[in-house]
Amino acid sequence: MTDTHLITTIDTAWDNRDSVSTDTTGEVRDAVETAINLLDSGKARVASRGDDGHWVVHQWLKKAVLLGFRLNPMDLIEGGIAGAKWWDKVPSKFEGWGEAEFKAAGFRAVPPCAVRRGAFIAPGAVLMPSYVNLGAYVGEGTMIDTWASVGSCAQVGANCHISAGTGIGGVLEPLQADPVIIEDNCFIGARSEVVEGVIVREGSVLAMGVYITRSTKIVDRASGEISYGEVPAYSVVVPGALPDPKGGPSLYCAVIVKRVDAQTRAKTSINDLLR
């Protein structure tokens, strides 16, 4: 099946998704499984960055992820600690894996991390007890720390640290047009949340407890400029509040307090010994 035919088949199936079910066979099922396998292997990504820095979302791959839920029946999911099982429509990425497969993949998977099939984990990445949903991409050398979650179709670049308890939002529910994107060399502080298709540009540092949605005001303290939906490259961001000019309650915002410098890098650098 050529790329063009694959995309057309999935787009057509999406337009007629009410007729897609666990009984569907043939070309539609083959196309969706092919797309999921491309995502799982890293040969395709839900979003890709152009030379101009603009991110392009490949909607057909996101559609394939969603169609998979209509095609796949509930089934036992093996692989839990002490023989634990789950009941779901998406198998574990590690289903059927042995020593050879883990060595070939080249990343660390610390128990009891969970990764659904259709997510790609690059060589050198470290998964602490965390969760990575299908369609997600985790770049080379990145650590997903304890109890952090990487949502469906989210894109996390290389050499990032996604700290403990952090949530990187997905696209499935509520249904989102664009995935969250964390570019290379970013540090996301513990218990932070980045959702609703927000882009965190390269080298940025989010302090502990920063929450950013599409509607969150991002305030540059130096200029007073307010923006939405994107953290500029090499920003240091902390939680803040904007006063109500009428004297009412202050409202939460994210504040760019400075640009990343040597001192920031010293505090947030990744540890090669752990990789």
Swiss-Prot record:
UniProt keyword terms in alphabetical order: Acyltransferase, Amino-acid biosynthesis, Cytoplasm, Diaminopimelate biosynthesis, Lysine biosynthesis, Repeat, Transferase
Major localization class: cytoplasm
Taxon lineage: Bacteria, Pseudomonadati, Pseudomonadota, Alphaproteobacteria, Maricaulales
Sequence positions that bind substrate: 108, 145
Keyword Transmembrane among record annotations: no
Entry GO MF terms: 2,3,4,5-tetrahydropyridine-2,6-dicarboxylate N-succinyltransferase activity
Stated family: Belongs to the transferase hexapeptide repeat family.
Signal peptide per UniProt: none
GO cellular component: cytoplasm
Gene3D superfamilies per record: Hexapeptide repeat proteins, Tetrahydrodipicolinate-N-succinyltransferase, N-terminal domain
Source taxon at top rank: Bacteria
Subcellular location: Cytoplasm
E.C. code: 2.3.1.117
InterPro entries: DapD_Trfase_Hexpep_rpt_fam, Hexapep, THP_succinylTrfase_dom1, THP_succinylTrfase_N_sf, Trans_hexapeptide_repeat, Trimer_LpxA-like_sf
Pathway(s): Amino-acid biosynthesis; L-lysine biosynthesis via DAP pathway; LL-2,6-diaminopimelate from (S)-tetrahydrodipicolinate (succinylase route): step 1/3
Record flagged with keyword Phosphoprotein: no
Quaternary data: Homotrimer.
Annotated protein name in UniProt: 2,3,4,5-tetrahydropyridine-2,6-dicarboxylate N-succinyltransferase
Reaction equation(s) it catalyzes: (S)-2,3,4,5-tetrahydrodipicolinate + succinyl-CoA + H2O = (S)-2-succinylamino-6-oxoheptanedioate + CoA
SUPFAM superfamilies, per database record: Trimeric LpxA-like enzymes
An individual GO BP term: diaminopimelate biosynthetic process
